[in-house]
């Protein structure tokens, strides 16, 4: 039973890829050589992310590196706050918090939200394995960015008064 889920995941990610094809010819070409392993499928999802406009690509990459480097599962709100933190600011700008649906839609099917726990996570444990193998080269400044964001967040004025 455990081996069945990755096959459905592979099919779902392939369907997501086909949905982005602009012409029938592009769909036919993609159907001629469907990805037969998850690593290739994840590579193709990353290519779809790379083809987005700069703002969307950067946000998707930030979502992916925050989730893949997190030492514990993050709630949607935690990730939204992390992504909204701006260097040098003394408080969180509520207008800079990205929408939950945007966070998942930009990530080419690689990220889902568990509606019961409100945890935003990678779609499958194999996705985490994939990112474990590529994240250092794919997101070279991620750990520095995460550390900087955490330090900025902890230095917000709201924490100076001891009320949070």
Predicted features along the sequence, with ranges:
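Short conserved motifs of the RecA-like P-loop NTPase core
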Residues: 1
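Leucine/isoleucine-rich amphipathic helices and adjacent mixed helix/strand linkers
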Residues: 5-164
């Amino acid at each position: 039973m455990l081996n069945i889920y990755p096959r459905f995941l592979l099919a779902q990610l392939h369907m997501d890829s086909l949905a982005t094809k602009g012409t029938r010819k592009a769909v036919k070409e993609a159907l001629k050589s469907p990805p037969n392993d998850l690593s290739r499928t994840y590579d193709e999802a990353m290519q779809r992310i790379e083809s987005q406009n700069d703002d969307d690509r950067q946000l998707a990459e930030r979502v992916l590196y925050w989730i893949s480097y997190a030492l514990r599962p993050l709630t949607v709100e935690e990730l939204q706050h992390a992504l909204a933190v701006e260097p040098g600011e003394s408080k969180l700008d509520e207008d800079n918090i990205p929408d939950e649906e945007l966070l998942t839609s930009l990530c080419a099917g690689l990220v889902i939200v568990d509606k019961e726990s409100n945890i935003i996570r990678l779609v499958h444990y194999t996705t985490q394995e994939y990112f474990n193998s590529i994240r250092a080269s794919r997101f070279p400044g991620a750990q520095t960015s995460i550390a900087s964001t955490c330090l900025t967040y902890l230095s917000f004025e709201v924490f100076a008064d001891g009320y949070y």
